[in-house]
């Protein structure tokens, strides 16, 4: 236990040294989009033998076991136990909204609608988050940021290219369920910020996964799904569960909860716009699926939208690099004021 704890702390120190502090959120955001986007291939494989809610339950069984084991090995008892009312409510909110409702509605809805329309409906999450933030937190987006979110959403529509038939076909109920999943994650993210739990985000994520896994198992039973055991499925299904459960759940959700705390729900949930891009790239790399001109153009539109939302951060970084070129100051230094960029 001591060796494991020492190794974990050592790894954390190395990670902090290798990535400058101002870039950690950006690196976490990109990594999160890759982990979420690359999970679709494994999920599609697993759903061939497992019903959707049971698959989601197993996913969070694995994720919770991995994260709770890591937390118990690397944190003192005082750090991983909820201590305040806000901690308990934070775990409950994350478990119900971000884990249970999000995944139950998303997995069920995907079974009755096309992947293209599911991507568009789920892409409304960053549009809904500012509405909940205004209602619950009093936060307001600038007109430029709102325009950037709209442009990024348009880029997602270009990438998935939904047809008019998908809007009026039999998948309308499925589209509504996926939209409900987007609303659940948007509302849960904002509620979590309002509650301001004091415990570290990693143990909070672990306990939320445990709560979500139990609730998903209950929904699977209540929905009459066949309770297939993991031992009775094929090797590919087991492998898909491990791939989804560890990197795309344990690691990805830990990153997501960290970003919710650091950059807020509106900016963190913009990852929903990058996921279709990483999913397309994963399909191209692993399955040989082609990248159409529409996908490349849509990616450019999404990048332009992000540029508007993060214009101040990008401008400050450009100024920092300019100063480095002129005066030789390291662009990765975190000390000192934000350098002016008047020219």
Functional labels for PLM-detected ranges:
Residues 30, 34-38, 42, 70, ...:
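Hydrophobic alpha-helical transmembrane segments of multi-pass membrane transport proteins
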Residues 62-66, 121-133, 211, 215, ...:
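Alpha-helical transmembrane segments of compact multi-pass small-molecule transporters, enriched
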Residues 46, 55, 59, 109, ...:
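Hydrophobic/aromatic residues within transmembrane alpha-helices
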Residues 51-65, 108-127, 170-184, 234-249, ...:
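Structural signature of hydrophobic alpha-helical transmembrane segments
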Residues 58-59, 94, 121-124, 144-147, ...:
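Hydrophobic core positions of alpha-helical segments in small-molecule transporters
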Residues 1-31, 64-94, 107, 140-146, ...:
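Membrane-interface interhelical linkers
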Residues 2-3, 132, 141-164, 173, ...:
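Hydrophobic transmembrane alpha-helices of multi-pass small-molecule transport proteins
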Residues 32-65, 114, 187-212, 230:
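Juxtamembrane helix-loop-helix junctions in multi-pass membrane proteins
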């Amino acid at each position: 236990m001591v060796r494991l704890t020492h190794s974990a702390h050592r790894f954390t120190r190395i990670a902090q040294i290798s990535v400058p502090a101002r870039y950690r959120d950006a690196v976490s955001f990109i990594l999160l989009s890759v982990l979420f986007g690359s999970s679709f291939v494994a999920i599609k494989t697993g759903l061939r033998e497992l019903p959707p809610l049971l698959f989601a339950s197993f996913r969070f069984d694995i994720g919770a076991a991995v994260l709770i084991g890591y937390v118990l090995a690397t944190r003192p008892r005082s750090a991983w136990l909820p201590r305040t009312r806000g901690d308990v409510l934070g775990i409950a909110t994350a478990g119900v909204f971000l884990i249970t409702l999000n995944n139950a509605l998303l997995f069920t809805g995907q079974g009755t609608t096309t992947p293209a329309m599911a991507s568009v409906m789920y892409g409304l999450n960053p549009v809904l988050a500012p509405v909940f933030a205004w209602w619950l937190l009093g936060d307001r987006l600038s007109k430029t940021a709102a325009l950037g979110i709209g442009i990024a959403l348009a880029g997602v529509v270009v990438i998935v290219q939904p047809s008019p038939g998908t809007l009026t076909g039999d998948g309308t109920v499925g589209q509504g369920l996926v939209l409900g999943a987007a609303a659940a994650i948007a509302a849960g993210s904002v509620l979590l910020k309002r509650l301001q739990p004091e415990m570290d985000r990693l143990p909070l994520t672990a306990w939320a996964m445990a709560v979500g896994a139990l609730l998903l198992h209950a929904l699977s039973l209540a929905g009459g799904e066949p309770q297939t055991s993991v031992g009775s499925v094929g090797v590919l299904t087991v492998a898909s569960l491990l791939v989804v459960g560890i990197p795309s759940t344990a690691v990805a959700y830990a990153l997501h909860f960290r970003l919710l705390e650091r950059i807020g729900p509106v900016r963190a949930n913009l990852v929903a716009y990058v996921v279709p891009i990483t999913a397309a790239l994963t399909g191209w790399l692993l399955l040989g699926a082609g990248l159409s001109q529409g996908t490349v153009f849509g990616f450019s539109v999404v990048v332009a939208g992000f540029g508007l939302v993060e214009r101040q951060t990008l401008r400050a970084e450009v100024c920092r690099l300019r100063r480095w070129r002129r005066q030789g100051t390291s662009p990765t230094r975190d000390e000192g004021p934000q350098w002016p960029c008047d020219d």
